[in-house]
C-alpha cells in the first residue's frame, strides 16, 4: 500500500533511482495505491546523464509492494520493497528495460508493454 510521502525504488532504466509518491490518482481523497495503480511521483535520486532529473514530477505505475496482492485462490504475493515504473504523458514506460519481477495483475491493456519487458511475471 503506497500513500503520499512513500518512497519507492524505480524498476526501469529511465535514470531515476528513488522516487517519492506525492499523489495517488483515481478519485478524490483516495489514500492508498496498490499494484497496477497510477501515482504522481517526484524524483528524489537520479543518476547523471539519465532521461529524468532530480526534482522532476512524473507519473508512475506501482509494480511491486511490500503489502502484496491477494489472488482469487487465496495466495498472497509480497515483495521485499516497493517499486514503480515511470510513465510518459501517453502512459507508456520511459525506460527501455524493466528490472525485477512484476505481477500478473499488470496484464491489462494499458501495461502490456511493461509485462513484455519484464524478465519475470509472477
From Swiss-Prot:
One of its GO terms (cellular component) is cytosolic large ribosomal subunit. InterPro entries: Ribosomal_uL14 (IPR000218), Ribosomal_uL14_bac-type (IPR005745), Ribosomal_uL14_CS (IPR019972), Ribosomal_uL14_sf (IPR036853). It comes from the Bacteria. SUPFAM superfamilies: Ribosomal protein L14. It holds the Pfam family Ribosomal_L14. One of its GO terms (biological process) is translation. Transmembrane segments: none annotated. Keywords: Ribonucleoprotein, Ribosomal protein, RNA-binding, rRNA-binding. NCBIfam families: rplN_bact. Part of the 50S ribosomal subunit. Forms a cluster with proteins L3 and L19. In the 70S ribosome, L14 and L19 interact and together make contacts with the 16S rRNA in bridges B5 and B8. Belongs to the universal ribosomal protein uL14 family. Binds to 23S rRNA. Forms part of two intersubunit bridges in the 70S ribosome. This is Large ribosomal subunit protein uL14. It comes from Stutzerimonas stutzeri (strain A1501). The lineage of its organism: Bacteria, Pseudomonadati, Pseudomonadota, Gammaproteobacteria, Pseudomonadales. The gene is rplN.
Amino acid at each position: 500500500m503506497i500513500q503520499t510521502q512513500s518512497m519507492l525504488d524505480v524498476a526501469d532504466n529511465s535514470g531515476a533511482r528513488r522516487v517519492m509518491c506525492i499523489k495517488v490518482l483515481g478519485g478524490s481523497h483516495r489514500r492508498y495505491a496498490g499494484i497496477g495503480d497510477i501515482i504522481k511521483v517526484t524524483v528524489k535520486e537520479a543518476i547523471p546523464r539519465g532521461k529524468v532529473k532530480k526534482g522532476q514530477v512524473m507519473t508512475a505505475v506501482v509494480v511491486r509492494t511490500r503489502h502484496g496482492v491477494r489472488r482469487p485462490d487465496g495466495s498472497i504475493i509480497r515483495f521485499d520493497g516497493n517499486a514503480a515504473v515511470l510513465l510518459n504523458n501517453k502512459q507508456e514506460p520511459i525506460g527501455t528495460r524493466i528490472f525485477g519481477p512484476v505481477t500478473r495483475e499488470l496484464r491489462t491493456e494499458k501495461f502490456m508493454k511493461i509485462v513484455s519487458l519484464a524478465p519475470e511475471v509472477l
